[in-house]
Amino acid sequence: MNVLIFGPNGSGKGTQGSLVKDRYNLAHIESGAIFRNHIKQGTELGQKAKAYIDQGELVPDDITIPMVLEVLKNEGKDGWLLDGFPRNLTQAKKLWEALQEEGINLDCVIEIQLDRQEAKDRIMGRRLCENDPNHPNNVAIDAIKPDGDTCRVCGGALKSRSDDQDEDAIDKRHDIYYDTQNGTLAAAYFFKDLARQGKTRYIELDGARDIQTIKNDLLNQL
């Protein structure tokens, strides 16, 4: 199974993506890791990408798309979950064209929907446990709200990430994601149109619900 997943930062996309990955034994392919792997291995594409990154510039799509495909064909040969790409409408169209040319199926697209303000509140409400950062603690979500400054799972001390408290940075990321004309949601809606044509499946999930309810809904639809 090959799956593409969308969701704003703060929507629980990582949690639900891990569920799908583990359930179907998929390779979790995250956009940032693609660049890191190619650069670390010194591939031709990696060297080209590094030149742009070192100059603080965005890597062009004609380099990014082949890098993504290479990882999908190798690491994801037995099935993949692609997370964090595409980020805009142009990339979505180019990715779809490339998949078609390579004869790679896109079996399912998952979109986790969440109101922008709620997503921001969740990001700013995240707290990390000193013993295990994966312990769920968030002052903005009643189901996983910690007891003061201690972890609700183990009692360890909690702290917040500095970037989680940077409203300007959060707003910039969300400006890109919630852009329905050219941004990430525009990319998601491109695949939604393909699903209407019977070319893939499109699953919409209400990210405002609790984790277990979203999980059950996702598994039922898969």
What residue ranges belong to the model's regions?
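Glycine-rich phosphate-binding loop of ATP-dependent small-molecule kinases
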Residues: M1-L222
